[in-house]
């Protein structure tokens, strides 16, 4: 999978995506990250990417021109469609014959979850546009992107932070990213789990007087599986009761 991230703050994305599992996934050619500065697609000497909103209001709005230019340059298109057609066909909705899925990180988007991550992990190419300021010109949403996505009901400094969370959740589902493929299935929120993951323990078996539950040391796999299921249900009931019944 190829993932292009278009942002005003590329360094926010580079560091976390070059560590741990994301670094190994790139080294194994599981995923290919490309991080771009939106200002590279501006045409004025000051590299302006925002302007005041029509109708007045607080803050600034991201201009459509550099966003359209960036996405059109990065989109994987059907080879039957020449680049000259792209530049001459100025007024149109969406990019024709496109193979890429275009995402806008925005607090007004659909709330991201594990099922959406699994669905998007089937794509071959994602282009992620990171919002900033008071948002983007609405023509970007109407005529360019495929999905607006929010990672939660809170406001971040910029969309680059959200983009890192977004691509990490997707890339770890790609075959070859994790050391144990079953790990992604057993995680909380996975498509095969209706709630949260249960508690985990490791050595030592006793720490400051707190002991690991005996069942985990018993070697009885059926009882261990039963205990884990019960504990997962208990944790879900206590922390996320809204998840109960989703997988039934």
Feature map (PLM): residue ranges:
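S-adenosyl-L-methionine/SAH cofactor-binding core of RNA-modifying enzymes
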Residues: 63-85, 89-128, 132, 138
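A short aromatic-anchored loop/beta-hairpin motif
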Residues: 42-43, 50, 54-69
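Short, hydrophobic/aliphatic alpha-helical segments
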Residues: 37-48, 114-117
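Structured adenosyl-cofactor binding patch, chiefly the S-adenosyl-L-methionine
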Residues: 136, 140-184, 189
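Hydrophobic/aromatic beta-strand patches that form the interior of the parallel beta-sheet core
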Residues: 4-6, 34-36, 103, 126-127, ...
């Amino acid at each position: 999978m190829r993932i292009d991230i278009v942002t005003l703050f590329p360094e926010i994305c580079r560091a976390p995506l070059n560590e741990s599992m994301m670094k190994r996934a790139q080294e194994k050619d599981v995923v290919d990250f490309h991080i771009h500065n939106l200002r590279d697609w501006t045409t004025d000497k000051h590299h302006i990417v925002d302007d005041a909103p029509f109708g007045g209001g607080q803050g600034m709005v991201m201009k459509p021109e550099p966003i359209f230019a960036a996405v059109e340059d990065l989109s994987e298109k059907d080879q039957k469609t020449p680049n000259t057609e792209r530049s001459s066909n100025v007024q149109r909705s969406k990019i024709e014959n496109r193979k890429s899925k275009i995402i806008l990180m925005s607090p007004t988007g659909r709330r991201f979850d594990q099922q959406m991550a699994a669905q998007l992990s089937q794509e071959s190419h994602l282009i992620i546009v990171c919002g900033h300021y008071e948002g983007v010109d609405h023509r970007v949403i109407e005529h360019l992107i495929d999905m607006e996505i929010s990672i939660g009901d809170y406001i971040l400094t910029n969309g680059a932070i959200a983009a890192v969370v977004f691509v990490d959740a997707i890339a770890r589902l790609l075959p070859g990213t994790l050391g144990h493929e079953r790990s992604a299935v057993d995680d909380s929120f996975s498509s095969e789990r209706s709630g949260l993951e249960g508690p985990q323990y490791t050595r030592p078996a006793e720490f400051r007087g707190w002991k690991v539950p005996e069942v985990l040391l018993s070697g009885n796999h059926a009882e261990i599986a039963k205990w884990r299921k019960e504990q997962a249900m208990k944790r879900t009931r206590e922390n996320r009761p809204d998840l109960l019944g989703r997988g039934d």
